[in-house]
A protein has these predicted regions:
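Amphipathic, charged alpha-helical segments and their helix-to-coil junctions
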Residues: 11-160
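Bacterial Sec-dependent N-terminal signal peptides
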Residues: 1-14
């Protein structure tokens, strides 16, 4: 009982805060620019992928028509078939490279945004005198008592 009393007195002085980082990030100008840059890259990569797919389809149809007419000598047919296989492999490789490039672009664009957010969280936490700031967007917390935990998402200091 005596041990519980000091803990109870100490617990009353603790301040906790919470934010929703996703709400904060989506209104940052840096986020809008990053999203636009990523969408532009995606459009370019998609256009190139579509162009190579159309080129492959055209050559494949020409090959099929030549085979159907039986107008190709065997060695030319083999060479064209090999060209088609090479085109398919290059296209698959390009698709994999494009996915990796998109993931890297996303990470590169978002890293400074998350750093800025984390720095702002630290500054707001220090200014508000809270012990912890929980991010409800990154870590689901089943219950938040709004009277005991300060919602810092729309912090008046506008550090976010």
């Amino acid at each position: 009982m005596l041990l519980a009393l000091p803990m109870g007195v100490f617990a009353q002085n603790l301040k906790f805060g919470h934010i929703n980082a996703q709400e904060i990030i989506t209104v940052m100008p840096e986020f809008t620019k990053a999203q636009n840059d990523i969408q532009n890259l995606e459009k370019q990569l998609t256009a190139e992928l579509q162009r190579t797919q159309e080129e492959f389809n055209k050559k494949y149809q020409e090959f099929q028509q030549a085979i159907a007419k039986d107008s190709l000598p065997a060695n030319i047919a083999e060479r064209r078939q090999k060209e088609l296989q090479d085109m398919m492999q290059r296209q698959e490789q390009f698709q994999q490279d494009a996915q990796q490039q998109m993931a890297k672009a996303q990470n590169d664009a978002m890293a400074p945004i998350y750093k800025k957010l984390d720095d702002a969280i630290k500054a707001v936490g220090a200014a508000e005198g809270v012990i912890y700031i929980f991010d409800l967007a990154r870590t689901p917390i089943p219950y938040v008592n709004e009277t005991l935990s300060i919602n810092l998402t729309n912090n008046k200091s506008k550090k976010f």
